[in-house]
UniProtKB/Swiss-Prot annotation:
It comes from the Eukaryota. Residues 107-390, 774-1061 form the ABC transmembrane type-1 domain. ATP binds at residues 505-512, 1137-1144. Residues 470-481 have a biased composition (Low complexity). GO terms for cellular component: membrane. SUPFAM superfamilies: ABC transporter transmembrane region (SSF90123), P-loop containing nucleoside triphosphate hydrolases (SSF52540). This is ABC transporter C family member 13. Signal peptide: none annotated. The gene is abcC13. It is a multi-pass membrane protein. Belongs to the ABC transporter superfamily. ABCC family. Conjugate transporter (TC 3.A.1.208) subfamily. Keywords: ATP-binding, Membrane, Nucleotide-binding, Repeat, Transmembrane, Transmembrane helix, Transport. GO terms for biological process: culmination involved in sorocarp development; sorocarp morphogenesis; transmembrane transport.
């Protein structure tokens, strides 16, 4: 028989597979929602979901193409606009009130179902009362048809109540999705509008936490909690009225006990709410730190600071768990009180009733059934109330976020007609980063900035160290938080239309603040600003999306192939595209992790150029490229394709100043502006500035004669030496060969960087549960907890047996007090075991939650860089936010429900079979059917949950990227496009919720029908039982079992669904780690392999590369090939080459950020692959190209391990010209800095990173474009500081500015991953046709030409 069933199943599977998969190109987005076209019967039974369920069961795991569209009323586009009418005002809880008014009360169907459900709740006890009376009749008084009629009534009464509950859940679900979608989208849209001051109050991590945790609590509550608060009081009142009718005024005693328990329940609920609010606060901080940790993971690894950050996160986790544990304790007390109340109600009611009445079967068991029906509302009402109270903190957090200050929607007068002067203007403009402290700004009414010109002239010409210490703006003594805000007070600015305006000034002078004022990113307090409608803006730190290079350039604009090709050529990107596997369709990693700094800047510039805007505002777009490329970009982009547009260029590269039509010199928020000749006439001496950066090679050339070098010193035979420069390559490449409308899908797939998020298939494996219990304590301890649960429930079941005995007075000669006494004993034992079981389970789940997070954090924290390259930060943060939140807040209740309901069902079945053995056969059939239905449901339910988790990651990834690129997105007016993208992501995620809830109802209706059938069969077989007491006991047990069986099945499946979070975390816990953190002496490997690493290593600083080859991925082309050279102790090596040549890879290979695929690197004769990563990285020093500043004090950013004294820190700050800046801050070294160093300029961040390295005083130091964001004068002073402080160190300097490395001991020229030249600067200069000599000649000729222009 089973073989035949399998054959049928196979045929169905094949047929279904063909019918569903025959059109593989089907667009699942366009599949209509089957509910909307379903018949009344299909809607009543939720049969419209069966296509998807059967697909999953017969064909295998369901795919996204099997999931239909959402109903229109659930889509974000429909629900989000409803929130437009919310008025926060001065009312209490405005958000909750608004949701109740606009999402709950307007749903008339749900209110009708609430009333219907309350009415049906008393139907089953009434039917039972008359059935018991019938059972107690003598045989002569009974007829089969009458008995059958009562059985049918019991079936109808039971099923009607449970069916109405299903629709109660259904309408609640729709409200939940309305609220989830609307609030999630509203938070994202609010983030797009946040002002600079508003944005500082929230990080991307805390906003993610709002959506994952707080909005999750909203969705959970408005799924059913909001209706429970309405229906439970009605239900309790109706059932109590029925109880009083059955047992008289004795029922009021029980009611009185309930009333007394409510304030205590409310107290516990408020305590739970308070502790939840506190835990959410620490959860926010934890998520912020985790987000910061993931975003800065490369820098933390380079500094060997992972453990420091992990400890900071763990401390916040410890505080979060402290309050979560308190919440669990109060939850246990609340559960104990609820269950104890039920027992006390029974004891008190029957004790009082027995005084004047005899306990009869119809009275006792009808009362018990009423109490069974009362048990859920009595237990769940306090839970619903404290869930509402717990929602209040989340509501306040969401309200606070939604009320943050926004950017000014109309801060400017946009000109688009000839009547308005089309120059870009600021008239008497006063700007501030924080719009909440206008009093901080003083308006002196001085409209003439000429009074400042002498001071600026003095600062530009004089180059003393003291005068060029970096400064910030005036600080308000009354507000310690204003130090980071550059103040622009009463300024006048002009950028002539169709002309080039260059803005220059020292580090921290206010250049970025000025352009931020032009695009509306800082608050305009007063004045007038004229800007065009369409502006392209490039930030100093390039913003790139995790998508293809082409999409980053198009940035939402339509493809114009001819213009696109011109942009690629103008931005010198053709040679870079030629090296990429899928050309411009190659996927760029998050924040452009697989690109060099110069490539990122050129892509950002290409985006601005392609947009074809009225005005281009470019903030330091040339700092990360070599001088030749910078000149090309200036001539072909800024002065080429942009030539007829208004251009505002912020730059430190003053060689371009003579080409400017208008020049603005900024110093400390003050402006002097005019043409070049006008500024010269005012005394601004640009010639002296230019002379500070001229390459000083004349003396070196005079000291040595030109000579031909030995082949051993210079790699003349290297074919790469003969290759063209980037500019020449750009000219020679046929652009049509690399840019095309036709694409090779195989190449595109191969070039993908991000890996697809894994989705497990099938049931949650036992290994996931074992892993959970192992982290909780042990599997044995959990089994012991289960035993206590079953023992506790066995004692509770004895109370029903005892009541049955009491009602029939089977023990002759015993008074009611005897029965009451032992009834109380059973209740007391039950309460004791109740306490034990809850605390045992709390220990398991709480320990698991704590240890899983620790394991996850350590696994991710010490994972390889490739892991972060291929997994977007949003996906990783999803584990730390949503998945951890589900484990923290849900698994305890789910395990408790499953064990409680499961043990109740087991004992109920045992009782029914014991009383009526004949029921065993139909029970077996029903159990088989039950199991089939559960299996059909479980397959799709698991897959939907897994897809829900996966579709959540794009929401967080987009949110993270949007937060990082807010300025760029707003300047390009791309908000609507990103809003639309988020709407799509949220709708897809809601779709998984919708169909997951729908199949919940599908199984619910069927299980409730089978449960009602169980009641019918139990009642039917009891008709043939001569023992009335046992017959009634079996029927009441069956009625009680229905509720618990269905709840057990639902909660078990929900538990399995939520264990998906454990499964997802476990997959990350098993992430391969980088390698050993510490060096291990292993004598077993032999003396030749032993590492003897002392504390002073490296003491010499000798470095040797031996045939090094490095690949970022096993399948990718090598980034470094056959690299062999030696660096002597105390040598200063300059590493040059075009952008993307492999310079940074050479540097970071010393830190083993990428392991050598071939060859080895030795420092002081020791192969660094044998050195622990922490030992290696902590022994080296680095100043990275993109500075990393994390949230915390300035002291913590400079000296996180508290190793140095204040005086040592101040000396380091003085050496990098930051002492006066930091000392002007109110709290000095204890001043708090926001994530990413908001409030500090790019150059200041670089200098702060430099101070860390100076303080560390390592023997080997890597400088990776460490001064690219610093003006030349400050750069010269920093260069002198480096020579003084690192004179006895081995230093590798990666730079595009040749003046930075011209005094190096040797120069290494890298091109296409190979070392093509390596010698002293003078030898390379004197070598005919050397690449370095060409670079020097180019810059020298360029500077000479510029000096003529000056």
């Amino acid at each position: 028989m089973f073989e035949r069933i399998n054959k049928i199943k196979k045929k169905i599977k094949e047929k279904l597979s063909y019918s569903i998969l025959k059109d593989e190109k089907i667009d699942y987005y366009n599949l209509p929602c089957p509910e909307e076209s379903a018949s009344f019967l299909s809607k009543l039974t939720f049969s419209w979901t069966q296509r998807m369920l059967m697909t999953g069961y017969f064909r295998g795991p369901i795919q996204m193409s099997d999931i239909c569209d959402l109903p229109d009323d659930v889509k974000v586009q429909k629900t989000n606009p409803i929130l437009d009418d919310i008025d926060f005002g001065n009312s209490k809880w405005p958000l909750l009130k608004f949701i109740y008014t606009n999402f709950v009360t307007k749903n008339k169907k749900s209110i009708f179902i609430v009333i219907l459900c309350a009415i049906f709740s008393i139907l089953s006890p009434l039917c039972l009362k008359y059935f018991i009376k019938y059972i107690q009749l003598s045989k002569n008084e009974k007829t089969f048809l009458t008995g059958l009629g009562y059985c049918v009534l019991l079936f109808v009464g039971t099923f009607s109540y449970t069916l109405s509950q299903q629709f109660l859940y259904w309408f609640g679900m729709r409200t939940s999705l309305h609220v989830r979608g609307a609030l999630s989208q509203r938070i994202y849209e609010k983030m797009l509008k946040l002002s600079s001051s508003g944005g500082k109050k929230y990080s991307s991590g805390s906003i993610m936490n709002l959506i994952s945790t707080d909005i999750g609590l909203f969705a959970d509550f408005f799924w059913i909690g909001h209706l429970e608060i309405i229906i439970f009081p009605i239900q309790i009142t109706a059932l109590l009225a029925l109880l009083c009718w059955i047992v008289g005024w004795s029922g009021l005693v029980g009611f009185g006990v309930m009333i007394i328990s409510l304030p205590i329940n409310t107290f516990f609920g408020s305590k739970m709410s308070k502790n939840l609010m506190l835990s959410l606060g620490y959860s926010d901080t934890r998520c912020n730190l985790t987000s910061e940790f993931i975003n800065g993971i490369r820098f933390l690894k380079l500094y060997a600071w992972e453990k420091l950050f992990l400890d900071r996160i763990e401390e916040q986790r410890r505080l979060q768990l402290k309050y979560l544990y308190r919440r669990v304790i109060f939850a246990i007390f609340e559960k104990m009180l609820s269950q104890t109340t039920n027992a006390v109600v029974l004891v008190s009611t029957f004790s009082v009733y027995s005084i004047n009445n005899e306990i009869e079967l119809s009275v006792a068991f009808t009362a018990i059934t009423i109490f069974v029906n009362l048990r859920q509302p009595i237990m769940r009402l306090p839970e619903a109330i404290h869930n509402l109270l717990g929602l209040i903190p989340s509501a306040k957090r969401v309200e606070s976020f939604l009320q943050l200050s926004e950017i000014q929607t109309q801060p400017f007068i946009n000109f688009n007609n000839k009547s308005i002067n089309d120059d870009i203007l600021i008239d008497n403009g006063t700007f501030n980063w924080n719009q909440d402290n206008d009093d901080y700004i003083t308006n002196n009414g001085d409209n003439n900035n000429n009074n400042n010109k002498n001071e600026i002239k003095k600062r530009l010409i004089e180059k003393s160290e003291e005068e060029y210490e970096t400064t910030t703006t005036t600080t308000d003594d009354n507000n310690n938080n204003n130090y980071e805000s550059y103040l622009l007070n009463n300024i006048n600015f002009k950028a002539p239309a169709g002309k080039l305006t260059i803005i220059c000034g020292v580090v921290g002078s206010g250049k970025t603040s000025l352009v931020s004022g032009l695009i509306g990113e800082i608050y305009k307090v007063s004045g007038r600003v004229n800007t065009p409608n369409k502006i392209s803006f490039t930030t100093q730190q390039s913003f790139l999306l995790s998508t293809s290079l082409r999409e980053n350039i198009l940035f939402g604009n339509e493809m114009n192939l001819e213009r696109y090709k011109k942009v690629i050529e103008a931005c010198c990107l053709a040679p870079d595209l030629l090296q990429l596997a899928a050309k411009d369709l190659t996927e760029i990693g998050e924040r452009g992790i697989n690109l060099s700094g110069g490539q990122k800047q050129r892509i950002s510039l290409a985006r601005a150029l392609y947009a074809n805007s009225d005005c281009y505002i470019l903030d330091e777009p040339l700092s990360a490229v070599d001088p030749e490329v910078a000149t090309h970009l200036f001539n072909h982009c800024i002065q080429g394709m942009m030539n007829d547009k208004t251009r505002i260029l912020v730059t430190h590269q003053l060689q371009f100043i003579p080409s400017a039509d208008h020049i603005v010199v900024v110093d400390n928020g003050k402006l002097v502006q005019g043409t070049y000749s006008e500024l010269k006439s005012k005394g601004i001496d640009f010639e002296s500035i230019m002379k500070t950066k001229k390459l000083n090679i004349d003396n070196q050339q005079q000291q040595q004669q030109q000579q031909q070098h030995d082949e051993n010193e210079i790699i003349d035979e290297n074919p790469m030496k003969k290759s063209n420069s980037l500019i020449e390559s750009n000219k020679l490449i046929n652009i049509d060969e690399i840019i095309s409308d036709k694409h090779d899908s195989n190449l595109i797939e191969k070039a993908k960087l991000l890996v697809k998020e894994d989705k497990s298939e099938g049931a949650i494996g036992l290994h996931v549960y074992r892993e959970y219990f192992k982290h909780g304590s042990s599997t044995f301890f959990f089994i012991a907890t289960c035993v206590v649960y079953f023992f506790s429930q066995a004692i509770f079941q004895m109370t029903d047996f005892w009541l049955s005995t009491w009602s029939q007075h089977k023990l002759q000669g015993k008074s009611d007090s005897f029965y009451i006494f032992y009834y109380i004993i059973f209740i007391g034992l039950f309460i004791v075991t109740l306490v034990i079981r809850y605390f045992m389970l709390a220990h398991v789940t709480f320990s698991a939650s704590k240890n899983l997070h620790t394991s996850l954090l350590n696994s991710v924290g010490f994972a390889s860089c490739q892991f972060f390259d291929t997994n977007p930060s949003g996906r990783i943060l999803n584990r730390f936010s949503k998945d951890i939140a589900e484990i923290d807040l849900l698994l305890y209740d789910l395990f408790s429900d499953v064990l409680y309901c499961g043990s109740t069902v087991v004992f109920a079945i045992c009782v029914m079979i014991y009383i009526s053995p004949l029921i065993s056969l139909p029970f077996l059939v029903l159990i088989i059917v039950y199991n089939i239905i559960k299996n059909i449901y479980a397959v799709s339910s698991r897959d939907l949950k897994r897809y829900e988790s996966i579709t959540r990651s794009p929401i967080f990834s987009l949110l993270q990227e949007t937060f990082n690129g807010l300025v760029t997105i707003r300047s390009y007016q791309q908000q609507n496009r990103f809003i639309s993208m988020m709407q799509d992501h949220i709708n897809i995620n809601l779709r998984l919720f919708y169909y997951s809830f729908s199949i919940h109802r599908w199984i619910g209706v069927r299980l409730e029908f089978i449960s009602a059938l169980v009641v019918f069969l139990t009642a039917f077989f009891s008709l043939f039982n001569s023992n009335a007491g046992f017959s009634v006991l079996s029927v009441t047990t069956a009625i009680g079992m229905c509720t618990y069986l269905n709840w057990a099945v639902r909660q078990f499946v929900e538990l399995e669904v939520k264990m998906n979070s454990v499964e997802r975390i476990e997959s990350y816990i098993n992430t391969p780690k980088e390698g050993n953190r510490f060096t291990i002496d292993n004598e077993e490997e032999g003396e030749e392999n032993m590492i003897n690493l002392n504390e002073k290593w490296p003491s010499k600083g000798e470095i040797e590369f031996r045939d090094v080859e490095i690949r970022y991925r096993p399948t990718s082309e090598p980034s470094l090939k056959n690299l062999s050279f030696k660096i002597n102790s105390n040598d200063h090596i300059g590493i040059v080459g075009r952008t993307g040549a492999g310079k940074s890879t050479v540097g970071i290979s010393l830190f083993r950020m990428v392991e050598c695929s071939k060859g080895s690197i030795l420092i002081d004769g020791i192969d660094i692959s044998k050195i622990g990563l922490h030992d290696l990285r902590s022994s080296l020093g680095i100043v990275p190209q993109d500075p990393f500043i994390f949230s915390g004090t300035i002291r913590l950013n400079i000296d996180p391990f508290n190793k140095y004294t204040d005086s040592e820190i101040w000396v380091a700050l003085e050496k990098v010209k930051l002492k006066s800046t930091i000392s002007s801050m109110p709290l000095k070294l204890e001043t708090m800095i926001e994530e990413g160093g908001d409030g500090l300029s790019f150059g200041q961040k670089q200098l702060l990173c430099l101070s860390r390295t100076i303080l560390k005083n390592s023997k080997v130091v890597l400088m990776d474009e460490a001064t690219s964001g610093i003006d030349y004068v400050t750069g010269d002073l920093i260069k002198q500081t480096l020579l003084e402080n690192f004179n006895d160190c081995t230093m590798l300097t990666i730079a595009h500015r040749l003046d930075t490395i011209i005094d190096s001991t040797k120069i290494a020229v890298v091109d296409k991953g190979e070392l093509i030249e390596y010698d002293t600067p003078i030898n390379l200069i004197n070598t005919k046709n050397s690449k370095f000599s060409k670079l020097v000649k180019y810059q020298t000729d360029f500077h000479k030409e510029n000096e003529k222009n000056f």
